[in-house]
Amino acid sequence: MAQIAPLRVQLIAKTEFLAPPDVSWTTDADGGSALVEFAGRACYQSWSKPNPRTATNAAYIKHIIDVGHVAVLEHASVSFYISGISRSCTHELIRHRHFSYSQLSQRYVPEKDAQVVVPPDMEDDDELQQILIAAVEASRATYTELLVKLNAKLMAGELGGNRAVLRRKQARQAAHAVLPNANETRIVVTGNYRAWRHFIAMRASEHADVEIRRLAIVCLRRLVDVAPAVFADFEITALADGTEVATSPLATEA
């Protein structure tokens, strides 16, 4: 029976800042937050922090977001390894063109034992889940049958070697046409701070699909841990149905 995969978002990389020794400047932050401040101050050579209202890293970053100088947010980045996400959801995710992606390949990795991601609206309904699982298992049986027949067809006359490997890939590529969007996939996503803010603003909205909204909320919580000054203006609240959204008065980029 197909197993259900829970959403998991793991931080796997973040920006490290190395202060140049010939610049007389210090900050109370590190990593990407320090880099963002450094980039902003480099524009005006304001190393002495002449404005006391922006002397701290948090105050400086809030100011640059307030005034729309968000290009400096592009210097720092975060990478996540995301699992327990459906193919359907990643079709939406990859529309965010400022991210970089590396996703599990259905051509190279057999899908007959892949886990399933249950749509949020079915999570509290056993009957709907049983219908979903039955449909998934039926599609996998068809996938397996097609794979066997395609392998036999494409491998006819092949004696092994690189062409045999290619034929197996071609068989998987053709057979996966019947696999459901509920199949779990896994993906590495890298984005700069500006791109992550845009993603959160768009996908943590009440108007977004619930699965990708849930992903955006989990990513936001991880991002706040990495760079609180950059992401803490987003407020997470619960809707009447128990799902969560995140909003910020400073998230103005559409």
Swiss-Prot record:
Q: What sections of the protein cross the membrane?
A: none
Q: Which GO terms describe its molecular function?
A: flavin adenine dinucleotide binding; NADPH binding; thymidylate synthase (FAD) activity; thymidylate synthase activity
Q: Pfam families of this UniProt entry?
A: Thy1
Q: Which GO annotations describe the biological process of this protein?
A: dTMP biosynthetic process; dTTP biosynthetic process; methylation
**E.C. number, please?**
2.1.1.148
Alphabetized UniProt keyword annotations: FAD, Flavoprotein, Methyltransferase, NADP, Nucleotide biosynthesis, Transferase
Q: Which residues participate directly in catalysis?
A: 203
Positions with a binding annotation for dUMP? 92-95, 103-107, 176, 203
| Reaction it catalyzes | dUMP + (6R)-5,10-methylene-5,6,7,8-tetrahydrofolate + NADPH + H(+) = dTMP + (6S)-5,6,7,8-tetrahydrofolate + NADP(+)
- Cite the InterPro entries for this sequence: Thymidylate_synthase_ThyX (IPR003669), Thymidylate_synthase_ThyX_sf (IPR036098)
Q: Which cofactor does it need?
A: FAD
Query: Motif ThyX motif, which positions?
Result: 95-105
The ThyX domain extends over 7-237
Hey, which pathway is this one from?
Pyrimidine metabolism; dTTP biosynthesis
Positions that bind FAD: 95-97, 103, 192-194, 198
User: What SUPFAM superfamilies has UniProt attached to this entry?
Assistant: Thymidylate synthase-complementing protein Thy1
The record's top EC class is: transferase
Kindly state what the record says about how the cofactor is bound. Answer: Binds 4 FAD per tetramer. Each FAD binding site is formed by three monomers.
UniProt record similarity statement? Belongs to the thymidylate synthase ThyX family.
UniProt-listed PANTHER family: FLAVIN-DEPENDENT THYMIDYLATE SYNTHASE
Functionally, this protein is described as follows:
Catalyzes the reductive methylation of 2'-deoxyuridine-5'-monophosphate (dUMP) to 2'-deoxythymidine-5'-monophosphate (dTMP) while utilizing 5,10-methylenetetrahydrofolate (mTHF) as the methyl donor, and NADPH and FADH(2) as the reductant.
Subunit structure and binding partners: Homotetramer.
Question: What name is this protein filed under?
Answer: Flavin-dependent thymidylate synthase
Gene expressing this chain: thyX
